[in-house]
Amino acid sequence: MVASGCSDDDDATPTTTSATPTTATPTTAAPPTTTASSSPAAGELTVQVFFLDEDAFNIGRPPYLRPVERVVDEAAPEAAALDRLFEGPTAEERAGGLRFVASQATGVSELRIEERTAHVYLAGGCNSGGSTFSVADHITGTLVQFTSVDAVKIYDPDGQTASPDEPGDSVPFCLEP
């Protein structure tokens, strides 16, 4: 099993978005990798962003996402976490087997959180390349840590998603395998 597009992490461009302020809550995933970035200052908090553990994916042993810690502005932590996600893993994290599968997306053009559902609009491209793992996995893993988010709907750059009006998560057809 190979994750198509695993080398996307150098092509990602961070984008500024806006979101409803909330606080982060711990997840039940594997323990986060701590980067050397330090403790948060006043007005900041530590959140997790989730990258693909390429070794686990290649041998078919979940969980495929591994959290790493990032310090973000506490005024809009959901949006800031997505910005950090699209920056990709650090060189040290890449050396440890973490990857960001951008699926041709370059960032997020808009983030809205309404009634505990995050609506994420991708910027750039949108193509899973046939992989069963896509940028949607990273985004969903990163956003559900926040108490403001129970579901994630991801839209392609044209504003389309598979189930816009149904409860629960949704991804655009371009991110289907």
Task: Tell what function each PLM region has.
Residues 3-177:
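Bimodal "functional hotspot" detector
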